[in-house]
C-alpha cells in the first residue's frame, strides 16, 4: 500500500483544489414571455429566442 513520504502543505492542497469551485448557472429572460430559462435552452412554455418552437 502506498504511503506518503512527507505531509502535503496547505499551499499544495489549495493549488490542487483551485479548479473545484462551482460556477453559477447562466440564466436568461425570454423576450416574448418574460420567463427565465437556461441559456441556449427552450423555456418551459415552448419559446426559444422569441419564437414558439414547441406546441403544448
From Swiss-Prot:
It comes from the Bacteria. Belongs to the bacterial ribosomal protein bL32 family. One of its GO terms (molecular function) is structural constituent of ribosome. GO terms for biological process: translation. Keywords: Ribonucleoprotein, Ribosomal protein. One of its GO terms (cellular component) is large ribosomal subunit. The gene is rpmF. Residues 1-35 are annotated as: Disordered. InterPro entries: Ribosomal_bL32 (IPR002677), Ribosomal_bL32_bact (IPR044957), Ribosomal_zn-bd (IPR011332). This is Large ribosomal subunit protein bL32. It comes from Proteus mirabilis (strain HI4320).
